[in-house]
From Swiss-Prot:
<dbReference type="InterPro" id="IPR050109">
    <property type="entry name" value="HTH-type_TetR-like_transc_reg"/>
</dbReference>
<dbReference type="InterPro" id="IPR017757">
    <property type="entry name" value="Tscrpt_rep_BetI"/>
</dbReference>
<feature type="DNA-binding region" description="H-T-H motif">
    <location>
        <begin position="31"/>
        <end position="50"/>
    </location>
</feature>
<dbReference type="InterPro" id="IPR023772">
    <property type="entry name" value="DNA-bd_HTH_TetR-type_CS"/>
</dbReference>
<protein>
    <recommendedName>
        <fullName>HTH-type transcriptional regulator BetI</fullName>
    </recommendedName>
</protein>
<dbReference type="GO" id="GO:0019285">
    <property type="term" value="P:glycine betaine biosynthetic process from choline"/>
</dbReference>
<comment type="function">
    <text>Repressor involved in the biosynthesis of the osmoprotectant glycine betaine. It represses transcription of the choline transporter BetT and the genes of BetAB involved in the synthesis of glycine betaine.</text>
</comment>
<dbReference type="Pfam" id="PF13977">
    <property type="entry name" value="TetR_C_6"/>
</dbReference>
<dbReference type="GO" id="GO:0000976">
    <property type="term" value="F:transcription cis-regulatory region binding"/>
</dbReference>
<dbReference type="InterPro" id="IPR039538">
    <property type="entry name" value="BetI_C"/>
</dbReference>
<feature type="domain" description="HTH tetR-type">
    <location>
        <begin position="8"/>
        <end position="68"/>
    </location>
</feature>
<dbReference type="InterPro" id="IPR009057">
    <property type="entry name" value="Homeodomain-like_sf"/>
</dbReference>
<dbReference type="GO" id="GO:0045892">
    <property type="term" value="P:negative regulation of DNA-templated transcription"/>
</dbReference>
<dbReference type="InterPro" id="IPR036271">
    <property type="entry name" value="Tet_transcr_reg_TetR-rel_C_sf"/>
</dbReference>
<keyword id="KW-0804">Transcription</keyword>
<keyword id="KW-0805">Transcription regulation</keyword>
<dbReference type="InterPro" id="IPR001647">
    <property type="entry name" value="HTH_TetR"/>
</dbReference>
Length: 195
């Protein structure tokens, strides 16, 4: 009989082991056996909880996207009466949170994006994440701009966030957070009306 609470502990162990494996050897070379060994479990446990490697990748990406959502929401909840500018900067901060810019997370995101082009479930997950970012940005810009301008500014800021993140991920170096925040802050202030 399984111990109570063991499922969530095992799932966490396996997701963490998946991130470690992707970080060290890449998604394609990370095997179920390697991931199980890192987690200290049998390969059968992975099959039991996730079916296969694709199920494990999906669960890992759901975990990372959940961390992204939490990072953004925690910052926004701290600014219930904040200006559009402050709330936009909070959204940027959530996207550049350590949970999203660690080496393991960046490599997992890259593997996820590549796999999402071929796997419908991962594609849907990627679309939800992308739409959420754009919707949050447009909503905040729309507090001070007409709808069309807010959509354009939101799209531009989303592209800047993704571009800065992607350049850092592909460089193999940590994201330069001060530079990323400076560039995004400049973009935000350029697009919001001045008092």
């Amino acid at each position: 009989m399984p111990k109570l609470g063991m499922q969530s502990i095992r799932r966490r162990q396996l997701i963490d082991a998946t991130l470690e494996a992707i970080n060290e050897v890449g998604m394609h070379d990370a095997t179920i056996a390697q991931i199980a060994r890192r987690a200290g479990v049998s390969t059968g446990i992975i099959s039991h909880y996730f079916r296969d490697k694709n199920g494990l990748l999906e669960a890992t990406m759901r975990d990372i996207t959940s961390q992204l959502r939490d990072a953004v929401l925690n910052r926004l909840h701290a600014l219930p009466q904040g200006s559009a500018e402050l709330r936009l900067q909070a959204i940027v901060g959530g996207n550049f949170d350590e949970t999203q810019v660690s080496s393991a997370a960046m490599k997992a995101w890259l593997a996820f994006w590549a796999s999402s082009m071929h796997q419908p479930m991962l594609y849907r997950l990627q679309q939800v994440s992308s739409r959420r970012l754009l919707s949050n940005l447009v909503s905040e810009f729309h507090r001070e701009l007409p709808r069309q301008q807010a959509q354009e500014a939101g799209y531009g800021l989303a592209a800047l966030i993704d571009g800065l993140w992607l350049r850092a991920a592909l460089s193999g170096k940590p994201l330069d957070k001060p530079l990323a925040h400076s560039l995004t802050r400049h973009f935000i202030t350029q697009h919001l009306p001045t008092d």
